[in-house]
Amino acid sequence: MVSTAVRTFARGIPWNLFLLTLGCGLFALGVKAVAIPHMLISGGVFGTALLINYMTETLSPAVWNVLLNIPIFIAGWLFVGRRFVLYSLYGLAVVSVATQYLDMTINITDPILASIAAGCICGLGLGIVLHSIGCDGGLTIISIALHKRYGISVGQFSLLYNITLFVLAFSMYNPDSMLYSLIMIFVYSKVMEDRKSVV
């Protein structure tokens, strides 16, 4: 009886919105307060938004993230579960709004320490998000849609996308920043692996 009630609560709207708010908020904190001041990029679509922002210095990363996600959410609405897409739309809103308006910088001068700190904060946030029925948009939705439509492995597509992103980043942007970004990616991947101990 108790376990049934717990499962029902875990699938409920308030709990999932709480997880998405907390997780996406932490991810945005790691990006805005640590990664951006050191010109680091994360993986996925948000990493693409950061790279475009660094190279063009036009729109903010948050705005680029929203623009890049528009066709992704349209595809997700057609090929992925609509409940998942609606929760993910909320997650995208939290990440984008927090990244746009959060005015905070964690004063870390050493780029390696900054990469580790950004990885820990972002990884903790994404680990929490993984406990919800949703995501922060972007690569997760693309991967699921391609898997459902064409049977492409979610993990393989994510890996291929991020390899392509970093190859382009190395060739088009500051190699030092990209190497530090790889440290950040490695750290937050490890933190995400331990997500069961977080929530």
Cite the ranges covered by each PLM segment.
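Short, Lys/Arg-rich, polar N-terminal cytosolic tail immediately upstream
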Residues: 1-13
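C-terminal ends of transmembrane helices
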Residues: 23, 27, 71-82, 132, ...
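Alpha-helical transmembrane segments of multipass membrane proteins
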Residues: 28-29, 51, 70-75, 97, ...
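Juxtamembrane/interfacial segments flanking transmembrane helices
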Residues: 40-45, 131-142
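Short amphipathic alpha-helical coupling elements at transmembrane boundaries
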Residues: 47-54, 141-151
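Conserved small/polar residues in nucleotide/adenosyl-binding loops
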Residues: 198-199
